[in-house]
Amino acid sequence: MGRVRTKTVKKAARVIIEKYYTRLDNDFHTNKRVCEEIAIIPSKKLRNKIAGYVTHLMKRIQRGPVRGISIKLQEEERERRDNYVPEVSALDQEIIEVDPDTKEMLKLLDFGSLSNLQVTQPTVGMNFKTPRGAV
């Protein structure tokens, strides 16, 4: 099993990533040199632990946002996604096909007056697997 990382290592790595994200990489040796240049770390062992955790977090950041780390690039990307407005509205189509349940939901949301709604029967026969032991 691996070792438990102390809060000192985790906090230092998070701060380093937030401030020096552009200089860091997925390579431990590169991150070790960057940590050595930018921070005063008292021991070689602690520096290596911090660099290792920085490398670990950088790999996680590549896959998606990481809790506790706010990077300007990720913040801008999130803003762009939140402010996205489609060029053509989904309601501006000539015919919108909905099933009866969706039609009822639209009525409850005061969208029942849309003229281009066409109620269609849902297709039966979806082959969903049932859990073992279910009747």
UniProtKB/Swiss-Prot annotation:
Which of the residues bear the PTM Phosphothreonine?
Answer: 130
Q: Annotated cross-link Glycyl lysine isopeptide (Lys-Gly) (interchain with G-Cter in SUMO2) - which positions?
A: 103
GO MF term list: structural constituent of ribosome
In terms of InterPro entries, this protein maps to: Ribosomal_eS17, Ribosomal_eS17_CS, Ribosomal_eS17_sf
Modification note: Ubiquitinated at Lys-103 by RNF14 and RNF25 in response to ribosome collisions (ribosome stalling).
Q: What is its main location?
A: cytoplasm
Locate the Phosphoserine modifications and list their residues.
113
Question: Nucleus: is it a keyword of this entry?
Answer: yes
Keyword Ubl conjugation assigned to the entry: answer is yes
| Cross-link Glycyl lysine isopeptide (Lys-Gly) (interchain with G-Cter in SUMO1), where in sequence | 103
N6-succinyllysine PTM positions: 19
Keyword annotations from UniProtKB, A to Z: Cytoplasm, Isopeptide bond, Nucleus, Phosphoprotein, Ribonucleoprotein, Ribosomal protein, Ubl conjugation
Biological process, per Gene Ontology: ribosomal small subunit biogenesis; translation
Localization annotation: Cytoplasm; Nucleus, Nucleolus
Annotated Gene Ontology cellular component terms = cytosolic ribosome; nucleolus; small-subunit processome
The record describes the protein's role as:
Component of the small ribosomal subunit. The ribosome is a large ribonucleoprotein complex responsible for the synthesis of proteins in the cell. Part of the small subunit (SSU) processome, first precursor of the small eukaryotic ribosomal subunit. During the assembly of the SSU processome in the nucleolus, many ribosome biogenesis factors, an RNA chaperone and ribosomal proteins associate with the nascent pre-rRNA and work in concert to generate RNA folding, modifications, rearrangements and cleavage as well as targeted degradation of pre-ribosomal RNA by the RNA exosome.
User: What NCBIfam families would the database entry show?
Assistant: PRK01151.1
Quaternary form? Answer: Component of the small ribosomal subunit. Part of the small subunit (SSU) processome, composed of more than 70 proteins and the RNA chaperone small nucleolar RNA (snoRNA) U3.
Name the family the entry cites: Belongs to the eukaryotic ribosomal protein eS17 family.
What is the protein's given name?
Small ribosomal subunit protein eS17
Native source organism of the sequence: Bos taurus (Bovine)
Upper classification of the organism = Eukaryota, Metazoa, Chordata, Craniata, Vertebrata
The gene is RPS17
